[in-house]
Each structure stands twice: as structure tokens, then as C-alpha cells.
Design a protein with these regions (language model features):
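Flexible "arm" and connector segments at domain edges
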Residues: 1-100
Length: 100
């Protein structure tokens, strides 16, 4: 196998970048073509499906990094705190700019 990545942390972090980029690409396609539209080559899979699938691919890579001890594992409470804080900030931003 030809690769310049010789250790697990490098490889897994590269996969995180790859999956995050694929989420970005799926979201961009949703904005361009519609969230419920699909790639002509995959008519049974919508752009919304692509976003969700790529999110869970990224989640799997984060989980592997946690299992390897490269990233810290969070409790469910810590996860919820981070998520809820982000939601609060985004909702406040949208409200401040009249986004409905």
C-alpha cells in the first residue's frame, strides 16, 4: 500500500478531514440542488441521506480516535452540554438576524 501515513493517529485524523469535507460537499449539493433531490446515479438516496450518512462516517472516525485514546471520551452529559450550547448560540444568531 502506497501511503505517507505511517501511524494510526495520522490516518484517523486524515479520515476525519475527509469525512468532514464530504459532509460539506453533501450540504453544498443540498443547497444547490435541493435537500430532497438526489444524484442521478443514486436515485434512492437523497441529498439529506448523504448528509446523514457522512455525519455518521465522521462520528465513527471520532469514536475510533476516542477508542485509541487519541481524543477524550465524553460522558453523555458532556456531549449534551456541548450540543445544547451550540444550538443556543446558533438560535440566538438566527434570531438576531431575523432568520426564520
Amino acid at each position: 500500500m502506497d501511503t505517507v501515513l505511517h501511524n494510526k493517529p495520522q490516518y484517523l485524523l486524515t479520515k476525519v478531514i475527509e469525512e468532514a469535507t464530504e459532509i460539506s460537499q453533501a450540504a453544498t449539493k443540498s443547497l444547490t440542488f435541493g435537500i430532497n433531490n438526489h444524484n442521478p446515479l443514486t436515485p434512492n438516496k437523497s441529498n439529506a441521506d448523504d448528509i446523514i450518512n457522512e455525519f455518521y462516517h465522521l462520528d465513527a472516525m471520532i469514536e475510533m480516535l476516542q477508542q485509541e485514546g487519541i481524543l477524550p471520551k465524553l460522558t453523555k452529559e458532556e456531549e449534551l452540554k456541548i450540543k445544547n450550547e451550540k444550538k443556543r448560540k446558533v438560535n440566538n444568531y438566527m434570531k438576531g438576524y431575523g432568520v426564520s
